[in-house]
Amino acid sequence: MFNERIFSVGITKFQINNFDNQTLCKQVEYFCTNPHNKTVNKRDMGLDNPHLIELNKVILQQSQLILNGLTSNPNVEVYLQRVWGNHNVNENICSPHVHRESFLSAVYYPKSTDGRIQFYSPFTDAILSHVPVIADKYHEFNSSQHTVYPKTGWLILFPANLLHVVLPSKEERHSIVYDIGVKLI
């Protein structure tokens, strides 16, 4: 086992209890109504959407906390680049992907009972490709992936360039996804 950690990849996840998830689900469904238009830009929910004001505030606050933990530069701040909704669009988000041109991504789940998002390590496959891994317990040094099982009301923030995939779900799932940038002030 290694005795020192030199690099790390973090995510933030927590439960939010005071949002009107029913209204947020209706908003997601409204912006995902065309079954032939599954591209992100066609599902844009609008950063100025009045139903997203409180969620936008939480996303900005949590994103700024992450940025502040990475740098002591007082001249940078986060901003919301775009927001879109997903409503059981399993076929479009089941390929591993990253969110290019962004600092962070955030996903809020106004409804999720069997949702799964899987993150892939940017490091471990390089070393594990030389070792047949049989492990009694998986940990950060011998795992090439990490699965999160979000429930209704969960918010997850992660580096936008972290490779991830949303695994298919059998039950109804709604999510609101943000890309977050950084700018000089």
Predicted regions and their residues:
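Catalytic core of non-heme Fe(II) oxygenases with the double-stranded beta-helix
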Residues: 88-157, 182
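Short beta-strand His + acidic residue motifs that chelate non-heme Fe in jelly-roll/DSBH
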Residues: 94-97, 164-170
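Short peripheral tails and domain-boundary helices/loops at the edges of structured domains
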Residues: 179-185
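Karyopherin-beta/Importin-beta family HEAT-repeat alpha-solenoid scaffold
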Residues: 2-4, 156, 165-166
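Non-heme Fe(II)/2-oxoglutarate
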Residues: 1-76, 84-86, 93
